[in-house]
A protein has these predicted regions:
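ATP-dependent phospho-/nucleotidyl transfer catalytic cores
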Residues: 1-19, 27-41, 49, 61, ...
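Structured loop/turn residues at beta-strand edges in well-structured enzyme cores
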Residues: 36, 53, 92
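Helix-rich C-terminal or lid/interface subdomains of diverse kinases
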Residues: 1-8, 12, 83-120
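Active-site activation/catalytic loop segments of kinase-like enzymes and analogous catalytic loops
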Residues: 51-85, 99-114
Length: 120
């Protein structure tokens, strides 16, 4: 199933993706304002991939409670302000990557809580 879903992602239009873009890795830089006031931590695993991945990391993190209406509003805000040319494609990638990322997070969490691997 995942292979079929991943085939739906546009692998030609790659962007820099930090892959760990969530609240714990954002910091406020006190003497700056606007976009310059946001600092990023833990970016050493950056790769080229779908721009939707980092937005998913921020808005759909299984470890955080983000109001679904707020997440939808922020997704629409991103689409309105960003350089996304195919909004339907972006939304589809967003959904696919949200599923993938949150399954991964939940498997890791369960594995740690049980102190044993899920798969051998």
């Amino acid at each position: 199933i995942f292979f079929e879903l991943f085939d739906k992602i546009n692998h030609r239009d790659k962007k820099l993706v930090l892959r760990d873009y969530h609240a714990d890795n954002l910091m406020v830089i006190a003497d700056q304002s606007g976009e310059n006031a946001v600092g990023l931590l833990d970016f050493q695993d950056a790769v080229l991939g779908s721009a939707a991945y980092d937005l998913v990391s921020l808005l759909e993190d299984a470890r955080r409670d983000v109001d679904p209406d707020l997440a939808l509003d922020l997704l629409e805000y991103y689409l309105a302000r960003g350089k996304v040319t195919d909004k339907l494609q972006f939304k589809n990638e967003y959904k696919i990557l949200s599923l993938q990322r949150n399954i991964k997070i939940n498997i890791i969490t369960i594995t740690k809580n049980r102190n044993q691997p899920i798969l051998n």
